[in-house]
Structures are given as structure tokens and as C-alpha cells.
UniProtKB/Swiss-Prot annotation:
Component of the GINS complex which is a heterotetramer of SLD5, PSF1, PSF2 and PSF3. The GINS complex plays an essential role in the initiation of DNA replication. It comes from Encephalitozoon cuniculi (strain GB-M1) (Microsporidian parasite). This is Probable DNA replication complex GINS protein PSF2. CDD domains: GINS_A_psf2, GINS_B_Psf2. InterPro entries: GINS_A, GINS_bundle-like_dom_sf, GINS_Psf2, PSF2_N. One of its GO terms (cellular component) is GINS complex. Disulfide bonds: none annotated. It is found in: Nucleus. One of its GO terms (biological process) is DNA replication.
Amino acid sequence: MAISPEEILHIAYEELVEIEPMTSIPELRLLERTYPPLMPLDIARIPLYAALLLKKSNMCKIRLPSYLQLESLKMSMDVEIEKADEYSCIHPYFFPLATELLENCYNVESIEESKMIVEKIKEIRLAKTLKGIKCLDGKALNMNNITLFEFNEIKELILGSAEVGRRIEDLAKDQ
């Protein structure tokens, strides 16, 4: 059974993020665990979905994760460019969460520049995938460090290419 993009997003929203309470927050009883009461100036790690609800209620500010800091994004893009034939290691929910976090965290240096770099990283990684699919021989495709989100986007293309390769191989054997 395949996992849908919506299911990936729901899983990604379970990711823990740091928040800074702006007011006293009572104990949070969530499905996975209970978080103790929080006071202003505390820093806590809670699931993104809860952080977004608290932010919407003006109860906290969400801190930008280090992997989305502008310098980190630039370094990730440089590594992707340098490693032309392999994927660099990025956060597993980098793509589904990047825009949401960039738009909701208070300590973003440059939202537009950061979004542009995230999009560029996505394009570079997609180009690597398409290059790999062109070389697909029907047996294997090595895709180390690809995220679940990326795989879900291109799986039909990969599976279709692999199936065509297998059929051609079977036809060649029959003759």
C-alpha cells in the first residue's frame, strides 16, 4: 500500500520544533506524551502541529530549525552542486516542512531568499533523479539519502521505467 503526500505531511507535522512561550502555557496532553506547563523564556520542544496551534493563538514563537538557517541552506545547496552524482544528506522532512517553517518562525533571516534556495535544492535533486532514471537498466537504482517525500513524488516514474526495462529484458531472453 502506497503512502500519500498528505500522510507524509501528517507524519512530518509530528516533528519536534523549539518554541518560546510568550505567556504561561498549561500542561499539554497530546497523544504521544504530556508536556509540562511552560512559562515565558522557557524553551521547549513540541510537535510542529501543536506549535502552529499555539502560535496561531499568540501563545508562543517558533524557532527556525538549524537546517533551515540561511547559511545552512546555502551550504546544503553547495554540497548538492558539488556532489553531482549523489544526493547529500538532508533532514528527512526538509521539503514538506520548509515553507511552513520559513513562514511561521520568527528568526528567519530572509524568507524569500531561503524559499528560493529550498526550491533550487529541490530542482538539483530532481535533476539527479532524472539523470539516474535515464541510466536505469531495470535491475537497480541506487538512491541513498533520498527523502520519503522525494521518493513519493517520483516513484511512479521509477517503477514505470523499471517495469519497461524488465519487459525489454524478458523479450530479449525469449528470442
